[in-house]
């Protein structure tokens, strides 16, 4: 459960992302594909080279979903229900991949905002991304 302080930290961190959200989403995906090559199996029809239009487009989808989640921290299941259905029933993404992408997103945020990435902010973002991952995998059961 996210505390009021966690929610404030997440909102402040995401506000600093600003107009770079789609780029950070794409960068996090690129990090995920490079660090965990098995994640590429879900994108056989994509050009997965760094900077590809398809990776950028999917990075924007990731960023848009996270922006929606940041704005709906009090109702993540409601905000992410359709996305959970999609990943569980149609795409059948292995739930571990959400944790891998979350880790790469944390690395991306830390790389771009090192001064703002305090231990408290890191912990809050980690809890938030874990909550998002839990919601996205909730329809698997």
Curated annotation (Swiss-Prot):
Pfam families: Globin (PF00042)
Chain positions found as N6-succinyllysine: 7, 11, 16, 40
Phosphoserine: modified positions: 3, 35, 49, 102, 124, 131, 138
Tissue: Red blood cells.
Gene3D superfamilies the UniProt entry points to: Globins (1.10.490.10)
Any one of the GO BP annotations: hydrogen peroxide catabolic process
A GO MF label: peroxidase activity
N6-acetyllysine modifications at: 16
Keyword 4Fe-4S: no
Keywords assigned by UniProt, alphabetized: Acetylation, Heme, Iron, Metal-binding, Oxygen transport, Phosphoprotein, Transport
Record's GO cellular component terms: blood microparticle; haptoglobin-hemoglobin complex; hemoglobin complex
Annotated positions of the Phosphotyrosine modification: 24
Residues bound to heme b: 87
Positions annotated to bind O2: 58
Residue(s) carrying Phosphothreonine: 108, 134, 137
Stretches assigned to the Globin domain: 1-141
Assembly, per entry: Heterotetramer of two alpha chains and two beta chains.
Family stated for the protein in its record: Belongs to the globin family.
Function: Involved in oxygen transport from the lung to the various peripheral tissues.
Record's protein name: Hemoglobin subunit alpha
Organism of this sequence: Suncus murinus (Asian house shrew)
